[in-house]
UniProtKB/Swiss-Prot annotation:
UniProt keyword list: Disulfide bond, Membrane, Mitochondrion, Mitochondrion inner membrane, Oxidoreductase, Protein transport, Redox-active center, Signal-anchor, Transit peptide, Translocation, Transmembrane, Transmembrane helix, Transport
Bias kind Low complexity: ranges: 130-157, 165-175
Quaternary state and interactors: Monomer.
Function: Required for the import and folding of small cysteine-containing proteins (small Tim) in the mitochondrial intermembrane space (IMS). Forms a redox cycle with ERV1 that involves a disulfide relay system. Precursor proteins to be imported into the IMS are translocated in their reduced form into the mitochondria. The oxidized form of MIA40 forms a transient intermolecular disulfide bridge with the reduced precursor protein, resulting in oxidation of the precursor protein that now contains an intramolecular disulfide bond and is able to undergo folding in the IMS.
Domain of life: Eukaryota
Domain CHCH: from-to ranges: 195-239
Protein name: Mitochondrial intermembrane space import and assembly protein 40
Mitochondrial intermembrane side, ranges: 62-266
Cofactor: binding comment: Cu(2+) or Zn(2+).
The encoding gene: MIA40
Transit peptide found in the keyword field: yes
Length: 266
């Protein structure tokens, strides 16, 4: 509205200026025919008219299409930005879904691994207990065999002790007089062992056995019998029979020990 009013006012002013200029030009042109008058043109009025005409043209030129075009151009990038944002959201949605599914798969795999580890940890004590039971079951026969071998050796040693004690007892019955408490070293039952190279050692061992009050009888005379056996080995020509009996007893003891070891190996 303001532009229309301004344009109208400028047109009126321009019209008045042009009319005034034409009137002056008519007045002065009448003098040209006789050559007496001079051609006088009002230049300020023409300049004002030209300026008003240019300003009117500038004011009349439509500016709305440019503004509309600028508005359309400004709206287009906004629409493009909205479309790009929507496309980005749509593209990010599958990625987010994929990442969530991947995380869910990792959690499930971790849960399965944890369950497997727990099962293995729970199974280890049972396996260890089973192995201990098998080891004990395998060791039990060996222990029983070893105990049986030890018992057998003890029985053999006891039998040997009984045999020696029996011989000593037989000699004691003939050589020892319980009424007087004396020992007859010349008794034939002693086989002359009291008068040989190891007679003193024999007497010490025999007397220890006769007067022993330990249980079993003669158990406190082992050292004296050992001294007597050592003396026998130093004089094999006189005590061959006794040494042979001793060697036989040693062989039997070694055989029993080897048999026990072979049983343990099986």
């Amino acid at each position: 509205m303001f532009r229309q009013v301004s344009v109208r006012a400028l047109r009126r002013a321009a019209g008045r200026s042009v009319c005034a200029s034409r009137a002056q030009m008519v007045r002065h042109s009448s003098t040209l025919g006789g050559g007496k008058g001079s051609y006088n043109l009002d230049m300020p009025a023409l300049a004002l008219a030209a300026g008003v005409t240019l300003l009117a043209g500038y004011m009349v030129y439509p500016r709305a299409p440019k503004a509309k075009q600028a508005a359309v151009q400004s709206v287009a990038p906004v629409n493009e930005n909205v479309e790009q944002a929507s496309a980005s959201l749509q593209a990010s949605a599958p990625v987010q879904a994929t990442s969530e599914s991947a995380e869910a798969g990792e959690e499930e795999a971790y849960g399965e691994e944890s369950g497997a580890v727990n099962e293995e940890a729970a199974g280890e004590p049972e396996e260890a207990a089973a192995e201990v039971g098998e080891t004990q079951a395998e060791q039990a026969p060996a222990v029983e065999t070893e105990q049986a071998a030890e018992a057998e050796q003890a029985a053999e040693a006891a039998a040997e002790d009984k045999a020696s004690a029996g011989e000593a007892a037989q000699g004691q019955q003939g050589a020892y007089n319980p009424d007087t408490g004396e020992i007859n070293w010349d008794c034939p039952c002693l086989g002359g062992m009291a008068h040989g190279p190891c007679g003193e050692e024999f007497k010490a061992a025999f007397a220890c056995f006769v007067y022993s009050e330990a249980e079993p009888k003669g158990i406190d005379c082992v050292e004296k019998f050992q001294v007597m056996q050592d003396c026998f080995r130093q004089h094999p020509e006189h005590y061959a029979e006794q040494l042979e009996s001793e060697e036989q007893a040693v062989r039997e003891t070694e055989a029993a020990a080897e048999s026990a070891k072979s049983d343990e190996g099986h």
